[in-house]
Structure formats: C-alpha cells, structure tokens
Amino acid sequence: MQLILISGLAGSGKSIALNVLEDSGYSCIDNLPLTLVPDTVERLAPLGYEQLAISIDTRDGASRLLEVIHALETAGHNVRFLFLEARTDTLIRRFSETRRRHPLSRTALTIPEAIARERQLLQAIAGLGHRIDTSDLSPNQLRRYLRDVIAQAPGRMLVVIQSFGFKHGVPLDADFVFDVRCLPNPYYDPALRPFTGRDAPIINFLTAEPLVQAMADELSGLALRWIPVFRHDNRNYLTFAIGCTGGQHRSVYLAETLAARLRETGETVLLRHRELDR
C-alpha cells in the first residue's frame, strides 16, 4: 500500500493537503489518533486499498511515530510522512481570519500560547519527514506544491531546492541554508533589475562572474557529497534553501543551476522559487 501520513501545526494547511490527496486518488482519513494507525492500515489493506492518506493526531503520541512508521514499512507498506508548519504570525492571522479556535486554546491558553505549546509538543517529529513551510503559500500554491510532491516516485529520496529572499524570512523547512548575498548583485544594474534568475540577461551576467561560478561548484560538490549519506540514513526528503536579499536574481540562478546538475546525476529534484511563486 502507498501510505501518506500527514501531521503538523493547527492552521498550517493539513485539511488542504488531505483534499489534494483525495483529488489525486487517495482514500483519506482525517484526524486519526496515532495509536489506531497500524490496526486501521492492516484492516484496510486486504480490502483492496492501494493508496491511503491519513491525517494523524500526534500531540499525545509523538514519541511513537518513528516506531509506527517502522512497523508499517516492515509490514510491506511504502510510507511517506508530511509535516506542515508555518510561522507563528501567519498562524495567528489564519485563526483570526477563520475565527476558529486553536485545539489547545480550550486549556485557557491564548492563541499565541497555544501555538507555542503545540510547536513544542511536535518538535520531536518535525524532522522525521518532509517539512513544508506554508507561511508564504496561498491555498492554491500549496495545492500545486503538494501535487508536485506526491507525483514523485515513492521509495526514492526527493531533493527539494528552494530559492528565497532573506528580507522575507528564512524557510522553516530547510535542512541546509546557504547565504549567497556576498555575490555580485545584478539588482544594482537598472537594465537588469526587472529580470529574474531564470532570464537570459541575468544568467549571462552571473555566468560571467567567477565568484558565482565558484559558489555554484561548491554547492554542487557539497550536495553530491552529502545526499548519499542522507539517503543511507533512510531520509525520504532533503531540502536545500538558497537565499539572497530579495529572492529574485542570485538565489534563483543558483537554485536552477544546482537543480540541473543534480538531475544530471539522476537525483529526483523538486525546484521551488518562493518569492517568484508569490
């Protein structure tokens, strides 16, 4: 069985994720306690369920998640785990807009306190799967991103390469963060400013800069050196985030370059430009 487990912070988009999976042909179960997952899967497998997505409640059993995933994999199921999160200010705004109560606010906590408490409870499992920071994603952007994620072949490690602008904050879901603000900046050339790192004028400018090419070589070398190590550690996802000031030129160019080089070696790569996708 192809099995996708979904967890994360309240308000981070778990319901949207489940809807995307349902539209993609998965049978879906919402808000199932973690302790019931193994028995539920074993009961459904003989009935012909080939693709199952479960949004799990892990606040009371986070410490057992790795054990549950291992047991499911031992039973022959292909398991992927998605963890959705967002910045606190984003979550507060979403709860304000929807006028929903945070699940932990019933314990007399304010919304910021409830978010902080839930983040603490789930901290141990955030790194066990594919972390997805939804802070800067609209519902439609999140749907597109998730469709790209689930389209990847199960059983292979997915390398996510993301460009971003430091002025908009560092992505929460990055395993590696590279600061390339030290490189020559085409922004200061008025003729180049309107373009992005995917456009020929910027590509030509940055390709001609020795420091930029040295950075591209170093990033590629580091990625190629360490991806096999993470794969050997049974990681399903690995995220590289490359940041410049605004996320328009240098980081986009280097993310495109790194993605192309990794694809040439046979890696499964998902490329995302956070600021261009806004």
From Swiss-Prot:
GO MF annotation list: ATP binding; GTP binding
Detail which positions bind ATP: 8-15
Organism superkingdom: Bacteria
Q: What keywords would UniProt list here?
A: ATP-binding, GTP-binding, Nucleotide-binding
Q: Where does GTP bind?
A: 57-60
The answer on whether this UniProt entry bears the keyword Metal-binding reads no
Described by its record, this protein's role is as follows: Displays ATPase and GTPase activities.
Family, similarity comment: Belongs to the RapZ-like family.
Q: What is this protein called?
A: Nucleotide-binding protein LHK_02029
Q: Which organism is it from?
A: Laribacter hongkongensis (strain HLHK9)
| Phylogenetic placement of the source organism | Bacteria, Pseudomonadati, Pseudomonadota, Betaproteobacteria, Neisseriales
